[in-house]
């Protein structure tokens, strides 16, 4: 029995290292420390009964915290009542946490395995031109007016651009662009 206790007693360097880890955990997550404290008393009994097992770093940290809690004297009845109330809360808290985990797990399964993935697009509305049609319409309109500015109104080379933009562009657009050209507010690169 003495050999088992000596084997589980950490060396000074291990204790120092574990105290650093415990301090870092408590400073990083003060909410979790409150939850861990009630569990320490229940795990202390398990550690004492099962001293033959090897301890992982987490269990070693728990044993260090247990040693500190056992060495702290309880001077008043209020202090002894507080851990008892904490144990009651600890028993209720894991049950509530398990229920939440079960609900979350069922939601995750439902999200991961959908029956079918349906891609739906809006039906084609021929009142509105497609993106490519819009781009080509604007480009041909600009090319036509560049050609007319360079070669004159009667140039036969410019007729093909006129046919292209008149077939692609809605007449409202052409009327608006013509007004903008006259006003000097046309957004395109015209000469």
Swiss-Prot record:
Q: Which CDD domains match?
A: Cyt_c_Oxidase_VIb
Q: Where is the composition biased (Polar residues)?
A: 1-14
Q: Bias category Acidic residues: which stretches? A: 99-114
Q: Which UniProt keywords apply?
A: Acetylation, Disulfide bond, Mitochondrion
Q: Where is the composition biased (Low complexity)?
A: 72-98
Matching entries from SUPFAM superfamilies are given as:
Cytochrome c oxidase subunit h
User: In which residue ranges is the amino acid composition biased (Basic and acidic residues)?
Assistant: 16-37, 45-56
What Pfam families does the database record attribute to this sequence? COX6B
Cysteine pairs forming cystine bridges in this chain are 137-169, 147-158
**Annotated tissue distribution:** Expressed in the whole plant.
For the region Disordered, give the residue spans.
1-126
Any one Gene Ontology MF annotation carried by this entry is:
copper ion binding
Q: What is its main location?
A: mitochondrion
What InterPro entries does the entry give? COX6B-like, CX6/COA6-like_sf, Cyt_c_oxidase_su6B
Q: Which GO terms describe its cellular component?
A: chloroplast thylakoid membrane; mitochondrion; nucleus; respiratory chain complex IV; thylakoid
In this UniProt entry, the residues modified to N-acetylalanine are 2
* Key word Iron present: no
Renumbered ranges of motif Cx10C motif: 158-169
What is this protein's function? Answer: This protein is one of the nuclear-coded polypeptide chains of cytochrome c oxidase, the terminal oxidase in mitochondrial electron transport. This protein may be one of the heme-binding subunits of the oxidase.
Q: Which family does it belong to?
A: Belongs to the cytochrome c oxidase subunit 6B (TC 3.D.4.8) family.
Name this protein carries in UniProt: Cytochrome c oxidase subunit 6b-1
Species of provenance: Arabidopsis thaliana (Mouse-ear cress)
The gene that this protein is the product of is COX6B-1
């Amino acid at each position: 029995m003495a050999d088992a206790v000596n084997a589980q007693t950490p060396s000074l360097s291990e204790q120092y290292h574990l105290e650093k880890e415990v301090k870092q955990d408590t400073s990083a997550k003060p909410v979790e420390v409150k939850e861990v404290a009630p569990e320490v008393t229940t795990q202390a009994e398990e550690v004492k009964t099962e001293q033959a097992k090897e301890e992982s770093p987490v269990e070693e940290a728990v044993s260090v915290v247990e040693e500190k809690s056992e060495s702290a004297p309880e001077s008043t009845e209020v202090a002894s009542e507080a851990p008892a109330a904490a144990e009651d809360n600890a028993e209720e808290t894991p049950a509530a946490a398990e229920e939440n985990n079960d609900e979350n797990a069922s939601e995750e399964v439902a999200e991961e395995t959908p029956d079918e993935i349906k891609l739906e697009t809006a039906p084609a509305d021929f009142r509105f031109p497609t993106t490519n049609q819009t781009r080509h319409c604007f480009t041909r309109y600009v090319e036509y007016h560049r050609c007319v500015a360079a070669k004159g109104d009667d140039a036969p080379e410019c007729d093909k651009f006129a046919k292209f933009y008149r077939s692609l562009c809605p007449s409202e657009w052409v009327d608006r662009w013509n007004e903008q050209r006259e006003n000097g507010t046309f957004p395109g690169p015209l000469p």
